[in-house]
Amino acid sequence: QSSSVLSDNGRYRIPNDNPFVSTAGARKEVWALGLRNPHRLTWADGHLIANSIGLHTWETVNIIQKGANYGYSLREGNEALQFDNHITALPEADRIPVQVTDTVTAGTVVPTYPVIQYPHKPGGGDAVGTGLVYRGSMIPALRDKYVFTDISTGHIWYADFKEMLAADDGNPRTMATMHEVKIRWKGQVYDTMFPIVESAYHARGGKRARLPGLALVSGEGRADTHVATDASGELYVLTKSDGVIRVVSRPR
């Protein structure tokens, strides 16, 4: 099954300009469809961004467009997803059915592809977390960059937001470049939040040998890492596995 992004107005009614209002049998509240698990949404400069957790292969960041079909369950990332859940190259005729209901289709459409993706492999992760465009002043190098996380591994990355918008060009191979955020904590520099969270988990009374939760890439539990900002646009890192909210301060 796939997920959709819905649109209603302030009175919980369906806007007249929703894309499927006039499509017979369609759910009129749907704004965009074909995402597996778009569990994190954020707005930036009038653009809606959805971080969607993948099945076995790709985690994705998507620019949500009116009426767009992001392909799931026939696409994952910029590849074709087969019925046995194996990934293959895209077909030359890259079109998929428009599924109006479980049994009714209405023609075909070219899928819309992500602007960022990363694999379920070391250096990537298991589940894309929160993301936001940083507007604060504490970290100039991140200003106007899209900062996002992987939940389980504790990776924090950024991408140039303008590059993300440019990557939404209809070419499935066009992706914005991901850059790793290094974390300085107590005099040491880390590639991910995972060792920081693991240390705090035990210091705060955690009883397990490893962090709780299942994570296939790390094999060692979940850091459960997310980002947020305050009213001034400054960045915070939230890690549920150790129950800590950390303020990101100016580099020293």
What are these regions (language model features)?
Residues 1-217, 222, 251:
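Beta-propeller domain segments
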